């Protein structure tokens, strides 16, 4: 009942304090918290419940009331309520402070923070809330970021404005420049058109002469066809022989294949048997291993389980006994507790009755029925009983809980005991099973022993089978080797057959050369092998000698070491005795000094210790209160003492070091004194000897000493000689070791060289195969060119490539000796040129040159390299960048591609020439039957003075000497020429040297035609040897009348001057006002028209000057002269692909159709170009505009002209 009384008191106190709290809350202006309200409600309920008797009981005593007022003890709830009220007041005060602060805030601050200052109150409230929430963005200004962004925008605007102004200025400049250039180009265009008319007149006159040349060429071709027919017959006979040989080889191969098949079947049968045996063995071994593992596992498991079950059985028995005793005790407790519970239930019933009576009494008191003091006494007594009963109730509840827990424990123990019994039964069953397993284990052991014996037998069998397998494998390897050999033989035979079918006599010669080279290489390899074996034998001999010498040296070393050791021992013993005696004396003196110093130090230490002890004795006599202070003082003194001792130790260390130094000095002084004393003794001894000698007493002793001295000197000399000899031997051995190491290095180097030679031989073989393949490819291309049965040649080998000459051509170069090497190089050069041209095409066009550069004076025109046509360049959307690859004779720059004339297949073209002598022009109209393919060409030819244009042809000699770097040559015969001089230059290959298989055949010459329009100096003359003309090219050049000496031939001038414009006219532009890029040009070079093929290597937007490589470097003429005539025939030709090459054999000189090259076509080359392509022999010129499906060719055929003079092409 104590808890209830306390609650009643607290409620009464709370009732008194309630009005105060309400007043405080009204003064503070803020109500209490929700917790305080809840507490109030609880208190009111308790006040209502409290009885009036208690209040009456408290009223009469006035003194007690005064005491309670003095010492008011507030409860926890009241204190919490007061605290909450105080917190509310503080919050209200803080709110008021914030309100006042926000009222003082200026509108400028609000505007900076929120961007506007119109609703001031609302913004202030927001500002206040932000301060309360402690936001981070209170001090931030809204206008900072936009202002900074505005500044950035202004700066960017200024920069963009400046850039735009610059671009506009640049655009204006470019516009002015383009306008100026366009005007200049218009003037030039008119000039070019006037000049092209004159050229057409020249072409008409040239046509008649070319017809005569064609007739001569036909006669030459007939002669050639007869020769080709004879050679074809010979080749067919050889083919028949080779076919018979191939059939024999095929029969042999079939025999070998049958033998191989039989042997392979045998091998397969044996391998199958072996596999079966191996599989059986593997299965048996696997089973035996598994059985062993199982047995071992079972043994281990059985042992573990037996031990574990025995331990578990013992533990379970012990647990059962403990559980049974524990259960008995719990049952006894249960019985006692059940009795107690019954008693408590009875008391509980009585208590419930008392409570009911109490409630009735309380009701009566509340109603005011009973107001007697006796009833009050009864109530008090009843209350006491109720309190006692409540205490008993608590005890009863505790006992009930204990009983429940005990019941639960009992149930758990019973359940656990049941489980233990079940486990014991399981263990017993398991024991019986394990006994059975033991029996099975013993049986399996016996089976294992039997299996082991079987395994050993099987192993023996497998060993025998393996031996048989190895024998079979060796046989199989031998068979495989024979197979591979046969396959190699087969492949080689196939290759030979294809080669013999496709290759001509030239390839046979090449193969012979290659075989000779291979034999030479094999001989070299054999020689190297022999040298290697000889070197190996020498190395072995040297190693044996070195080993013997090293053994001897070791013996000598050991003997010398023993001698030296004995001598040094004797000397060391004598020296040691002397030193030991001296050291003893020094040590004794030092030890005496040290002992003295140590004694002094020990005495000082003892004195200090005695002093410390006396101080300590006096301190112990002090009273107890001052002991702590004295101890601290002692500690401080001891610390100081320790420091002093450390300093003393340092001093002692220093003194020791000084002592050691003094000791060393003393020893040195003592040594000096001993040495001096010895010298004194020797001097005394000598003085005594001298005196004795003077007296004649000690002569015999001096003689003996001298004799001994001489003997010792002789011994020392012998020893020195021996030492020297040993040193020399050691040096020799070292040298030999170095030689050995060098020999090993040389041996390794030789091995490497040998390996390299082997690899080289392999590479040579591969190269031979590659070359044969390349020649096959070239033959395939030539097969596409040759007609089948019209009497012409069967095989046309292209001997002139279209590659750029990138290095000087050496006359005696080994690589140029064979046509295979030449063909390979030509393909490489083609690829190289195309890659260069692609790079140039990708480059940006360079800026135009100034007016002075474009229009140089007439004096400088002779040194210009290329003609420049700006209006044409503009049509092709960009100028070509002049390439200068160095000061070479074949240097030139390129020009964009021109349009291609593409007549329909099988339809002839008609050329109509209309000359105009008044305007010095001629119009060339090239038409096909339909109106779509109509083209016209207007040629303007300038006449110097009042001379009329005419065409003259100079027959030139056909002997050419090809030099890589020649000066600008001139034509041999000097004569007065017409305004336009067309010069045909003929040459053929020299039959000398025996390099070609067709050297005995007459070869068609190569003709070069030069056309130039400007005057050249008459002083230019160069020897025939210094002239260079590329094989397989025709060069067109126009020269005026005043040129007394023929102008030098310029190869592949940069810009082709035959252009087709939008009005379907071909304009061939000539003249001296063409712009040329400044380059390395020789004196006397006149402006040149160069017409070159589209589909050869210079197949891009840049046409580079090219020098062609030919299989033979030297060219000589054939005796015999004939007339030179030439005609132009234009016929449409269908091409097999979009690109084509014109390649004709230098030996045969027959015409051939264009064939596709391996050079890829760039997109910029889709526009066609007029093409002049000389064949390999140089007797065929084709004007071939390229189209997608067909091409038109203008063939310029010339006959051979023989003369002994040589003529070369000039630098282009």
Swiss-Prot record:
Tissues expressing the protein: Expressed in muscle tissue, including heart. Found in cortical ventricular zone.
Region (Disordered): 1-73, 871-898, 948-975, 1102-1190
Compositional bias ranges of the Low complexity kind: 1124-1138
One GO BP: neuron migration
Keyword annotations from UniProtKB, A to Z: Coiled coil, Cytoplasm, Cytoskeleton, Phosphoprotein
Cited Pfam families: CortBP2
Keyword Cytoplasm: yes
Domain of life: Eukaryota
Biased composition (Polar residues): 1-15, 1139-1155
Record field: compositional bias (Basic and acidic residues): 32-47, 60-73
Entry GO CC: actin cytoskeleton; cytoplasm; glutamatergic synapse; postsynapse; postsynaptic actin cytoskeleton; stress fiber
Modified residues (Phosphoserine): 137, 978
Function: By acting through a filamin-A/F-actin axis, it controls the start of neocortical cell migration from the ventricular zone. May be able to induce the degradation of Filamin A.
Membership in a protein family: Belongs to the FILIP1 family.
Subunit structure: Interacts with FLNA. Interacts with RHOD (in GTP-bound form).
UniProt cross-references to PANTHER family, sorted A to Z: FILAMIN-A-INTERACTING PROTEIN 1 (PTHR23166:SF3), FILAMIN/GPBP-INTERACTING PROTEIN (PTHR23166)
The protein's name in its UniProt record: Filamin-A-interacting protein 1
Gene that encodes the chain: Filip1
